[in-house]
Amino acid sequence: MENGGAGTLQIRQVLLFFVLLGMSQAGSETGNFLVMEELQSGSFVGNLAKTLGLEVSELSSRGARVVSNDNKECLQLDTNTGDLLLSEMLDREELCGSNEPCVLYFQVLMKNPTQFLQIELQVRDINDHSPVFLEKEMLLEIPENSPVAAVFLLESAKDLDVGINAVKSYTINPNSHFHVKIRVNPDNRKYPELVLDKALDYEELPELSFILTALDGGSPPRSGTALVRVVVVDINDNSPEFEQAFYEVKILENSILGSLVVTVSAWDLDSGTNSELSYTFSHASEDIRKTFEINQKSGDITLTAPLDFEAIESYSIIIQATDGGGLFGKSTVRIQVMDVNDNAPEITVSSITSPIPENTPETVVMVFRIRDRDSGDNGKMVCSIPEDIPFVLKSSVNNYYTLETERPLDRESRAEYNITITVTDLGTPRLKTEHNITLLISDVNDNAPAFTQTSYTLFLCENNSPALHIGSISATDRDSGTNAQVTYSLLRSQDPHLPLASLVSINADNGHLFALRSLDYEALQAFEFRVGASDHGSPALSSEALVRVLVLDANDNSPFVLYPLQNGSAPCTELVPRAAEPGYLVTKVVAVDGDSGQNAWLSYQLLKATEPGLFGVWAHNGEVRTARLLSERDAAKHRLVVLVKDNGEPPRSATATLHVLLVDGFSQPYLPLPEAAPAQAQADSLTVYLVVALASVSSLFLFSVLLFVAVRLCRRSRAAPVGRCSVPEGPFPGHLVDVSGTGTLSQSYQYEMCVTGGSRSNEFKFLKPIIPNFLPQSTGSEVEENPPYQNNLGF
């Protein structure tokens, strides 16, 4: 009985839902299928494709699936063949109770585009239940004066089957007093009445009994039996009469248990026990017996179980009043259940797609259906989502909704959405239901790697070891997964003369930069190149950055003395007159340093001297000057060692050796002016005289006298011959060139300081530059020396 009541409740819900469905789906295609109950799971129901006129391939490509209203999966669809199969054994009595026909409604959900097709599955009854009497023994008390053809009620049998398989007829054992007559009640169920064929005589037969048999219409038919005992009583010739033949009442579905529904009342004209009335439900269904209770004495009908308008909207109850003599009267009570807003909306999810790509608008995220079991405004619903999210709800047929993206999403801004779908009814008070989903956004390669800096400046000391880590670059990608994996590379240099591949390398995984070989500041002070960062997306995205490498100078070059040149040939001798004043400029030590900056700042100091204190060296310019007055006691020859030191760390140095000759009566040298042409002519005559004198080697004494005379004559003349110094001619080594322009000399010089011989005019050359520039291409050329010349005084 309980299963039957639940089935009736479900059937009423299904019928109500599909009445609304039929109104909203007018004109849509419907597939009708028929199946017998109790078939095994996997049994063939029908071919959906043929019934609806669809292609089998369309079912598979559009992801067709069967969706039921109560979320039960009774059917399954084979998308490869289009066949509908049973997912479970169907029990018609459990599904529909006593309702006939038993029709189940399903929808076929198809995507791209979203479409709903209706399926009606009629479950046909089989004769799997026998009629059953609730009371195995019935007791009837019949007055002896009951007229022939008097009718007496018998309890009906219950058969869960319907249609032809339900109870069809009743029979009793053949006897001379009674026969059975079959009646049909308002709900089309048959019940038996016992008809008196022959008057009863209490004195002759006070009691008799027979078997009541109920037969259904199945093949073969099933039956059930009960024992009927008839007790003959004395005369009771008045039946009870109700005050109203029909009662109609209304009751709210949320009424509390024990509430009084209605009171029925009847009377009997008899007296004594024959007028004592007893109220009962006549042939009431199980739902009625579970929900209501009648007081047999007072006729009060009270509520014993909760009401549910959505399950049963009304009850029709036959009330029987029976007197003490067995006579009865009947009345009908109709109880109308009034709906209250006691059901919150329901959400049934059909499909959810997560994660979804970030760059695809109008993507269907979720398909769901809403419903409210209430009626009227209580069953009207409003569906909504928060306004601050890029999603939109679109309604479809039969209260189906789709949740779609409103615009392209950006995973880098937000990778996850927690969406709350709220369904609110319009009843009083309003009830709502919320459904939360978490939606993940999958990454699309829409962000190129970004360097932390647009340009990088790296510093590297020269003379580095190969494979030295000189710095790192870094780029980040806002994407995720393989789209965020960055690979670094060197880009082709725009300078065709820069051998970038032999200078640096880069680790493709972490961006570490390495120097491939040792660098020389004097050859390469700086260079720049571009690096690229590419991700692993499809298509791959990339970006570039500029890298500048500045080579830092190391103190790896010692000072080089340009003058006096230390080449192992005849030493350079400087002549100083004994009459020179303190601070007299003897000579200037000229040196350069191939380094730059502080490493090329040179300082000079006198390291050794034949006579300390006689000469001094200026620290910043290398000038060698006399420190005091010269005297006759000072030696004629002096050897000076000048130390040239740079300002590097550690400092490097070089030495220059000078020979100084003190000469008596030696005037200051000067360069002849253009107006001194007559004096030059005298110098030429004197040269001829000296050559002749030197050719005369008659005696050493004569040579000494002539030498003394020559010296005297030189003092008087304006010619300014000085000592001889042989310096090589030709280019200097190219590594002495200050390539950066920041060295000690911006231009390198070679000096020639001697008196030329073999010339008709005694031309005196003093610190004349003979090499204007040091060129890099002269590196490694040999140094040539001019043969020493002697002036006509023999120095």
Swiss-Prot record:
Compartments reported by the entry: Cell membrane
GO CC terms: plasma membrane
Q: Where is the signal peptide?
A: 1-26
Query: A Pfam family matched by this chain, by name?
Result: Cadherin
Please give the Gene Ontology molecular function terms for this protein: calcium ion binding
Query: What are the glycosylated positions?
Result: N418, N436, N567
Show which residues sit on the Cytoplasmic side of the membrane: 712-795
The keyword Cell inner membrane is annotated on this UniProt entry: no
Tell me the protein's name.
Protocadherin beta-12
Q: What is the lineage of its organism?
A: Eukaryota, Metazoa, Chordata, Craniata, Vertebrata
